[in-house]
Amino acid sequence: MKQESVQQKNISIMSSFSGSRKVYVEGSRPDIQVPMREISLSPTTGSFGDEENQPVRVYDTSGPYTDANADVDILKGLKPLRATWIRERGDTEEYEGREIRPEDNGYKGKEKASHSYTGLKRKPLRAKKGQNVTQLHYARKGIITPEMEFIAIREHVSPEFVRDEVASGRAIIPSNINHPESEPMIIGRNFHVKINANIGNSAVTSSIEEEVEKMTWAIRWGADTMMDLSTGKDIHTTREWIIRNCPVPVGTVPIYQALEKVNGVAEDLTWDIYRDTLIEQAEQGVDYFTIHAGVLLRYVPLTAKRVTGIVSRGGAIMAQWCLAHHEESFLYTHFEEICEIMKTYDIAFSLGDGLRPGSIADANDEAQFAELETLGELTEIAWKHDVQVMIEGPGHVPMHKIKENVDKQMEICKEAPFYTLGPLTTDIAPGYDHITSAIGAAMIGWYGTAMLCYVTPKEHLGLPNKDDVREGVITYKIAAHAADLAKGHPGAQIRDDALSKARFEFRWRDQFNLSLDPERALEYHDETLPAEGAKTAHFCSMCGPKFCSMRISQDIRDYAKENNLDEEKAIQKGLEEKAKEFKKAGGSIYS
């Protein structure tokens, strides 16, 4: 891969949406600039009266890639937005960091990764001795950080509300001090429901440039966080390219890379190898780690009678290690030491559900809930260290069993944020699992899940490409927004109301621009009504001009206005006039 190809690949998507522009809302200090996408609307005219429609501002995750005025260079990485805030606190220090070794990228001996990241090189940061640099620690001390104020503006709440939710453990701010490029965001049930998009190469397919492109593509469509699940060669370098160019938090499953370092043999894993991998990724800037510390030796037999056994890759790795050594998981026995690493860099736990159900037949079984009890125990240990925690959840769960998952998680894990994969509500739709899971995602988001991990049409079938990523993100944005509406999140309905008004007034361009996928909406409209005149027509292709329900409604309103009647009387008077016309014409149905 040539460096130029990475830059060229990403330039192709560095554009704003039609009818939109990037705006920034300033906070209490000049360097708090909160990005939003402002959608311009055309005025209401004609029979609807003359009225200016105010632009609509929406939450934006796309970073500088959709800012026409931003100077983005993939080779250098994004600007370190939070660097000043981190430095001002005075509790961090630079140090040399660990040396990058060939095995970090899956190579042996002197063989090196084929594509090093040649951009901006910084020494990593860590907490000074005796210091804790987590947002949870600051929140519990009563400190409102610039990150919290930034989030408050994004979420339309007060900074104190953000601080209190973080201090209570009900919300987390994933924000590794070595990822200053990230724009602060929050994951918690009292905020917008967030979505995560998974990317990553494998030994079978994909390259560094494809993964960087998928990242910029996913955040364009609304991904709030990214997980790099790479398992092939160049793991370290792929992650470096992604993090240096990513404006949203990045998560990983460190056991994947640790396994690569022992040639894929689970029983050869050791605590020392895993610990070294945690520090390697911490220095790069990973914001949250999925750690399957709840998979205990005694729980493994509980999966024996399942239809689909253990389907979590991380869960299966640790189960295999436990059985091979007949010992308790080193993730569990060394959990306090892991907490020390996490608070040194402000990395959040995403406590993995290694025993999640992989089929609806296995949903809500003994193995799943036994692990959840252990995750509750680990949550309290992490909180003792002021380390941020969210809990991962299923999986495959039929609709009538979804609420029990949320209720149990809230109780056992003391309201720590819940982060679920779907869940998929049926197992019979390979190729359409973005839909089967979005049904469950909307429901579980409504019940209180804070973040939804997207599912693409390729789930269970193959690695997603760029188009699959878009499909998955949009599908999950729909689910998350539906949950926000159901929960009554402040301002959630503004965009819906604006689009409904535009639809009723046949402002087609505004309808396209207000939608989650403006390009798809325009494309579908053009398939049947491609002419430019159709963009101002007072009907659509569904019913045509004579039978358009909204046009008929407007005609009734116009008739009422002309005859000084309310709408109900206008309908009755109109019917009477039509009856007279019918009788005058001879009263025959067929003439």
Curated annotation (Swiss-Prot):
Comp. bias regions, Basic and acidic residues: 91-114
Pathway linked to the protein: Cofactor biosynthesis; thiamine diphosphate biosynthesis
GO biological process: thiamine biosynthetic process; thiamine diphosphate biosynthetic process
Keyword match Secreted: no
Gene3D superfamilies assigned to the protein according to its UniProt record, in alphabetical order: 6.10.250.620, Radical SAM ThiC family, central domain
GO molecular function: 4 iron, 4 sulfur cluster binding; carbon-carbon lyase activity; zinc ion binding
Pfam families: ThiC-associated (PF13667), ThiC_Rad_SAM (PF01964)
Gene Ontology annotations for the cellular component aspect, listed alphabetically: cytosol
UniProt: [4Fe-4S] cluster binding residues: C540, C543, C548
Binding site residues for Zn(2+): H396, H460
Catalytic activity: 5-amino-1-(5-phospho-beta-D-ribosyl)imidazole + S-adenosyl-L-methionine = 4-amino-2-methyl-5-(phosphooxymethyl)pyrimidine + CO + 5'-deoxyadenosine + formate + L-methionine + 3 H(+)
Biological role: Catalyzes the synthesis of the hydroxymethylpyrimidine phosphate (HMP-P) moiety of thiamine from aminoimidazole ribotide (AIR) in a radical S-adenosyl-L-methionine (SAM)-dependent reaction.
Similarity field: Belongs to the ThiC family.
Protein name listed in UniProt: Phosphomethylpyrimidine synthase
